[in-house]
């Protein structure tokens, strides 16, 4: 098995001359095909490892040079028991008002004067009662690291950086599901990785997989760590050594091909680093999931991710031209970077959505576009959610959707309004009041029924303005009123700070989560209504004293349907086992989604949290096909995170 996994890189190690000949042929063929020359990865890996080990004693763990957003010691920059950066959090200031700390976001340092009242009134929260939680990881509470000494010795000889420290291992034992974060604050996981390894390139990954096969170890890959499907949780009964293979140091753009508008990147690069570096050359991918700051290209591929601007740029399956994955059987990749092939079932679709069960994605070629010259925000207020959905359906039918369009139901609109920062200008405050008066009094909109769509247009300026008029004309036919560019822009600026709200809630006995689905257009309204009602009913039956927050928004539109996001939260004071209540309610909501014609997931993936419904979602035969692929590619279950199957 280990020999099979070695692939071309392993053969090169055994026969250096043959390896050099193969690399020369590959480079030569690349020239003949007009493709960008790829630097010989093996030599580059050796150079990086040599640099990382300079000054280190042979017995020491090599300390590789770092770059990119995510350092090896993630806990130095990011929260170990919550979302995002250490310096950014919502808190109550000395005046009892909510503000966001730090300087990273447009909302940072600003006061949100109405959010406190909204939290109290909506969820029955008493701000005099705070929860207690651990302030740091206690190494003595972490399960001990058990690692084969022969494996460690070979890892050192390969000069691959690693750690067995408790804080490094705990940080990579989880994603960001409510259960995981709650457990971090209150206790400890039953099982965590035994060792964290940091490959710096494709060939390092090949060596790690070879060693795992040789010693029968379990590998769980991790990119940005933003999973919301229990995808990173270690199986409690796994007796083998668990390796957390952290791709964060594989974070380079290897080349940009301006003729074919593609970029070849390492899979550990984060979305924000990728977009920032491409922008320096005048390009972008346009792929912007809400987790853009921390999620990685490899993570996008392995979960079949979607970005908010998919209407222009496509989902991840539309963006990927080529990819490389290391498996226990060897390396999977196509021989051509052609834009489309008719060569049987597309092997890319075995890799996309595989969620770390087959191997490690190491590199990918993705489409890029010139950075748009013009960008404009907008918003539309509708009398109710139903008319808003009808408008979005018509926009999709006419295929004129802007880069992004999101429709909030009334409760989410109210929540968004509560996140509005304090206005310093009397004139601005007066204008806001005038707009509200016009919509509610003059136009007769009920404040408790209003639904709002936020819009983002981008591209050529003249075309954007034409496109904008077309969308607003359609909206008017469904009772929609233009609600201003500022409201639209604020809606999108909140994208990257919403996740921080949950951490504030946890301090005051509020637990919550978001989940998503996709559904045909004719099921959207019924599905939204029934799922929200099911959440309220389940909470009441399970002893939740205050009505839960149960809200939704339509976030993506397609010819044949839409993606819907749900948010729910409740005050758990007085409940002895809040996690059980929460998980039963979330499972009931998923059952309701499936009963109403929704999908198991649109882009979060299956992981372990939704795997119980996978067989009924894809049929017995489809499930058997997935199992057969797994059994062939990974017969010893080296990639043993137990997602999907």
Curated annotation (Swiss-Prot):
Residues annotated as site: Important for enzyme activity: 406
DNA-binding recorded as keyword: no
Domain called FAD-binding PCMH-type: residue spans: 189-371
Modification sites for Phosphoserine: 52, 57
Chief location of this protein within or outside the cell: membrane
Binding site for FAD: 221-227, 290-296, 303-306, 355-361
UniProt keyword terms in alphabetical order: Acetylation, FAD, Flavoprotein, Lipid biosynthesis, Lipid metabolism, Membrane, Peroxisome, Phosphoprotein, Transferase, Transit peptide
Any GO molecular function: FAD binding
Active site: 565 (proton donor/acceptor)
Pfam families the UniProt entry points to: FAD-oxidase_C, FAD_binding_4
Catalytic activity as recorded in UniProt: a long chain fatty alcohol + a 1-acylglycerone 3-phosphate = a 1-O-alkylglycerone 3-phosphate + a long-chain fatty acid + H(+); hexadecan-1-ol + 1-hexadecanoylglycerone 3-phosphate = 1-O-hexadecylglycerone 3-phosphate + hexadecanoate + H(+); 1-hexadecanoylglycerone 3-phosphate + a long-chain fatty acid = a 1-acylglycerone 3-phosphate + hexadecanoate
Residues annotated with N6-acetyllysine modification: 89, 334
GO process terms (BP): ether lipid biosynthetic process; lipid biosynthetic process
Transmembrane segments: none
Pathway: Glycerolipid metabolism; ether lipid biosynthesis
Boundaries of the annotated transit peptide in chain numbering: 1-45
Region (Important for enzyme activity): 602-604, 641-645
Binding residue positions for substrate: 502
Gene3D superfamilies named in the record: 3.30.160.650, 3.30.300.330, 3.30.465.10, 3.30.70.3450, Uridine Diphospho-n-acetylenolpyruvylglucosamine Reductase, domain 2 (3.30.43.10), Vanillyl-alcohol Oxidase, Chain A, domain 4 (1.10.45.10)
PTM sites of type Phosphothreonine: 61
Function: Catalyzes the exchange of the acyl chain in acyl-dihydroxyacetonephosphate (acyl-DHAP) for a long chain fatty alcohol, yielding the first ether linked intermediate, i.e. alkyl-dihydroxyacetonephosphate (alkyl-DHAP), in the pathway of ether lipid biosynthesis.
Subunit: Homodimer.
Protein name: Alkyldihydroxyacetonephosphate synthase, peroxisomal
Record organism: Mus musculus
Gene: Agps
């Amino acid at each position: 098995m280990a020999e099979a996994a070695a692939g071309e890189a392993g053969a090169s190690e055994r026969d250096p001359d043959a390896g050099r000949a193969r690399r020369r042929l590959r480079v030569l063929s690349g020239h003949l095909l007009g493709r960008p020359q790829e630097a010989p990865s093996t030599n580059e890996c050796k150079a990086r490892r040599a640099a990382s080990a300079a000054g280190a004693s042979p017995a020491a763990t090599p300390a590789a040079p770092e770059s990119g957003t995510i350092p090896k010691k993630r806990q130095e920059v990011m929260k170990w028991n919550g979302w995002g950066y250490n310096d950014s959090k919502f808190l109550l200031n000395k005046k009892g008002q909510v503000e966001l700390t730090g300087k990273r976001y447009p909302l940072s340092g600003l006061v949100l004067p109405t959010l406190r009242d909204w939290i109290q009134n909506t969820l029955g929260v008493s701000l005099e009662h705070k929860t207690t939680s651990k302030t740091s990881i206690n190494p003595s509470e972490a399960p001990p690291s058990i690692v084969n000494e022969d494996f460690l010795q070979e890892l050192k000889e390969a000069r691959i950086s690693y750690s067995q420290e408790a804080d490094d291992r705990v940080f990579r034992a989880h994603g960001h599901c409510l259960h995981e974060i709650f457990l971090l604050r209150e206790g400890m996981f039953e099982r965590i990785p035994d060792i964290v390894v940091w490959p710096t390139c494709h060939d390092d990954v090949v060596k790690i997989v070879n060693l795992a096969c040789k010693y029968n170890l379990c590998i769980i890959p991790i990119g940005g760590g933003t999973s919301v499907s229990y995808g990173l949780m270690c199986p409690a009964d796994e007796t083998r050594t668990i390796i957390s293979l952290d791709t964060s140091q594989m974070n380079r753009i290897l080349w940009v091909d301006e003729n074919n508008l593609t970029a070849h990147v390492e899979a550990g690069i984060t979305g924000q680093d990728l977009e920032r570096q491409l922008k320096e050359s005048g390009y972008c991918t346009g792929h912007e999931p809400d987790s853009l700051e921390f999620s990685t290209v490899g993570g996008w591929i392995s979960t079949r991710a979607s970005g908010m601007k998919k209407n222009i740029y496509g989902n991840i399956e539309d963006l990927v031209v080529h990819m490389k994955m290391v498996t226990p059987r060897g390396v999977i990749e196509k021989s051509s970077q052609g834009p489309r092939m008719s060569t049987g079932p597309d092997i890319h679709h075995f890799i996309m959505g595989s969620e770390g069960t087959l191997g490690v994605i190491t590199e990918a070629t993705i489409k890029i576009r010139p950075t748009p010259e013009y960008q404009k925000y907008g918003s539309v207020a509708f009398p109710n959610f139903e008319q808003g959905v009808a408008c979005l359906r018509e926009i999709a039918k006419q295929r004129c959707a802007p880069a992004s369009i999101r429709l909030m139901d009334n409760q989410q609109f109210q929540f968004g309004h509560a996140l509005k920062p304090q206005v310093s200008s009397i004139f601005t405050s007066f204008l806001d009041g005038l707009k509200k008066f016009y919509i509610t009094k003059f136009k007769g909109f009920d404040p408790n029924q209003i639904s709002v769509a936020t819009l983002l247009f981008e591209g050529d300026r003249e075309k954007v303005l034409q496109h904008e008029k077309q969308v607003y004309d359609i909206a008017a036919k469904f009772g929609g009123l233009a609600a201003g560019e500022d409201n639209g822009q604020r809606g999108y600026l909140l994208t990257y700070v919403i996740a921080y709200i949950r951490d504030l809630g946890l301090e005051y006995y509020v637990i919550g989560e978001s989940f998503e689905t996709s559904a045909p257009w004719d099921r959207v309204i019924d599905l939204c209504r029934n799922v929200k009602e099911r959440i309220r009913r389940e909470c009441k039956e399970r002893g939740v004293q205050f009505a839960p927050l149960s809200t939704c928004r339509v976030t993506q539109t397609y010819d044949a349907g839409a993606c819907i996001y749900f948010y729910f939260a409740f005050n758990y004071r007085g409940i002895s086992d809040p996690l059980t209540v929460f998980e039963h309610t979330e499972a009931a909501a998923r059952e309701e989604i499936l009963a109403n014609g929704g999908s198991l997931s649109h882009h979060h993936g299956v992981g372990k949290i939704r795997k119980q419904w996978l067989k009924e979602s894809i049929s017995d035969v489809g499930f058997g096909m997935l199992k057969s692929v797994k059994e062939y590619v990974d017969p010893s279950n080296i990639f043993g995170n137990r997602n999907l199957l």
